[in-house]
Amino acid sequence: MTKLEISKPKFGELTQIASDLYWAHFELPFRLNHVNLFLMDTPSGILILDAGLKSDHSEEHWEALINGPLKSKKFAGLLITHYHPDHIGMAGWLQDKLNIKCYTSEKELFTAKTFRSMPDDKYADIFRNVFVRAGMSCLLYTSDAADD
């Protein structure tokens, strides 16, 4: 295996990691503090791999890329790898902004639609149960303890 000597891209920049593959690094406003997005140069144009979290910061980052290193590029589409909000959140914005199609698997589309239509507390219960089954403590925080 060859170790690549590459630097993390800064805001509004792309890092080329192969002849036809580029890396974008978007900050996130929570503990998982970033998401890596990739762009592939194809014969049909740039294929965006994942969209980023729906946020003002992501929109500003995409605007900087679109008006900067991607300014003269044609876009082939958007491929969403999985339903997590930090990967699918900006999909609609990118589709509208770039007039491109979005591609994902039926399973990921179904999962995204299911979770999006679910109340926040139900969504939280599902993930709490997943983490507890994986060995996490059931009680992570109680608001009563904050007053002590």
Question: What positions do the PLM features span?
Answer:
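Short glycine- and acidic-rich boundary segments immediately preceding or forming the N-terminal edge
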Residues: 2-14
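Active-site metal-binding motif and surrounding structural segment of the metallo-beta-lactamase
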Residues: 57-109
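A short beta-to-alpha transition loop/helix N-cap that caps and shapes the active-site region
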Residues: 110-115
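Short, hinge-like loop/turn segments at secondary-structure boundaries
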Residues: 118-123
